[in-house]
Amino acid sequence: MNDRLFISALRLLPKNALSRAVGALTRWRAPVPVRVAAIRAFARRYGIDLSECPDLDVYRTFGEFFARPLRPGLRPIAPGERVVASPVDGAVSETGRVEAGRLVQAKGIDYPAAALLGDEALAARFAGGAYATLYLAPKDYHRIHFPLGGRVTGWRYVPGKLWPVNPASVRTVRGLFALNERLVTVLETPLGACAVVAVGATVVGRVCAYYDPSIPFTNLPGAAPRRHDYETPIPVEKGQELGAFEMGSTVILLFEPGKARLDPRLAPGVRVRVGEPLGGAA
């Protein structure tokens, strides 16, 4: 099936409702033998390295496996307070600079930063700055880590659709990352302001943030846009867990102009892992 036929078929599906249904199923506490067998089958299908995970019988639900932690010490964090560490395991989708207020999604397709962030004033801070888009496949570790140390100054929740974010969708659905539901975490770091955008996708049941338990789970029926700026920002360390997806999706990093420089070797398709250096001070 070519990309356009695939997307046309997806337009007919109730993607948000489907994602909520799948999410509910992944939170079902099936008997341990059933749960472990399902996890092993999923791992074989997608090539997941189970040696990185705790014993499979510790997961109470399939969803807990999706958002699994890793064994300690498997993802060393690149040292240096001005070195940007990868927040996720995944593949580079695009990197570049925010030009004329827009980011590149794929060849011939771009979209506005203001729509992505749900905040024009916030988007203006990143005009001319570097950005990186990182795609998490179903096989990848699904937790998100802070790329730099600093303070969380606020967040934005933008409800939306739940299109897939696989390469076929990225090539075909215009403005995909500004259409899908997303959670934006805003940081002040040694490299200035940084936004970490967690973009939802089909059958990504929820995106959750660990730094503030009061932030609501995403993908709730009838959700409205929300924003919060902290009177007392939350201190965080580089490599600390920010949150998690319950399936694969996409994370987008944005930086202020003249502050951060990304490694030019980060071409589309290059694999990265949590903690690996993505760049540093401009």
UniProtKB/Swiss-Prot annotation:
The record marks 248-249 as: Cleavage (non-hydrolytic). It is a peripheral membrane protein. It is found in: Cell membrane. Keywords: Cell membrane, Decarboxylase, Lipid biosynthesis, Lipid metabolism, Lyase, Membrane, Phospholipid biosynthesis, Phospholipid metabolism, Pyruvate, Zymogen. It holds the Pfam family PS_Dcarbxylase. Its main location: membrane. It catalyses: a 1,2-diacyl-sn-glycero-3-phospho-L-serine + H(+) = a 1,2-diacyl-sn-glycero-3-phosphoethanolamine + CO2. Transmembrane segments: none annotated. GO terms for cellular component: plasma membrane. Binds 1 pyruvoyl group covalently per subunit. The active site is at 89 (charge relay system), 145 (charge relay system), 249 (charge relay system), 249 (schiff-base intermediate with substrate). Disulfide bonds: none annotated. The modification Pyruvic acid (Ser) is found at residue 249. One of its GO terms (biological process) is phosphatidylethanolamine biosynthetic process. Is synthesized initially as an inactive proenzyme. Formation of the active enzyme involves a self-maturation process in which the active site pyruvoyl group is generated from an internal serine residue via an autocatalytic post-translational modification. Two non-identical subunits are generated from the proenzyme in this reaction, and the pyruvate is formed at the N-terminus of the alpha chain, which is derived from the carboxyl end of the proenzyme. Its cofactor is pyruvate. InterPro entries: PS_Dcarbxylase, PSD-B, PSD_type1_pro. GO terms for molecular function: phosphatidylserine decarboxylase activity. PANTHER family: PHOSPHATIDYLSERINE DECARBOXYLASE, PHOSPHATIDYLSERINE DECARBOXYLASE PROENZYME, MITOCHONDRIAL. Belongs to the phosphatidylserine decarboxylase family. PSD-B subfamily. Prokaryotic type I sub-subfamily. Heterodimer of a large membrane-associated beta subunit and a small pyruvoyl-containing alpha subunit. This is Phosphatidylserine decarboxylase proenzyme. It comes from Anaeromyxobacter dehalogenans (strain 2CP-1 / ATCC BAA-258). The lineage of its organism: Bacteria, Pseudomonadati, Myxococcota, Myxococcia, Myxococcales.
